[in-house]
């Protein structure tokens, strides 16, 4: 089973061409706010193998949806 990855916004650099810039990149982990909106706490997320980035303060709705889908798939994998 593949663990979910968090998406975050990329910083804008003035030396990059706009057509080569991507809007999002893979982040270090999920923020605490995203975990709380998905119904998890830090300890349970780490037990499940989800990486937590405690420095991030932003909450992206896409990441919350990814976490909810991941949690729905867990009982199906165990049975």
UniProtKB/Swiss-Prot annotation:
Entry GO CC: ribonucleoprotein complex; ribosome
GO biological process assignments: translation
Presence of keyword Ribonucleoprotein: yes
Record flagged with keyword Ribosomal protein: yes
Pfam families listed in its UniProt record: Ribosomal_L13e (PF01294)
GO molecular function, one term: structural constituent of ribosome
Entry keyword set: Ribonucleoprotein, Ribosomal protein
NCBIfam families, sorted: PRK12277.1
HAMAP family named among the record's database cross-references: Ribosomal_eL13
Family label: Belongs to the eukaryotic ribosomal protein eL13 family.
Protein name listed in UniProt: Large ribosomal subunit protein eL13
Species the sequence originates in: Saccharolobus islandicus (strain L.S.2.15 / Lassen #1) (Sulfolobus islandicus)
Lineage: Archaea, Thermoproteota, Thermoprotei, Sulfolobales, Sulfolobaceae
């Amino acid at each position: 089973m593949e663990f979910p990855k968090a998406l975050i916004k990329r910083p804008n650099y003035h030396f990059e061409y706009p057509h080569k810039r991507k809007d999002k990149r893979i982040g270090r982990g999920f923020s605490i706010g995203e975990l709380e909106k998905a119904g998890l706490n830090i300890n349970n997320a780490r037990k499940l193998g989800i990486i937590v980035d405690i420095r991030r303060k932003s909450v992206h709705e896409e990441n919350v949806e990814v976490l909810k889908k991941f949690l729905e798939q867990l009982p199906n994998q165990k049975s």
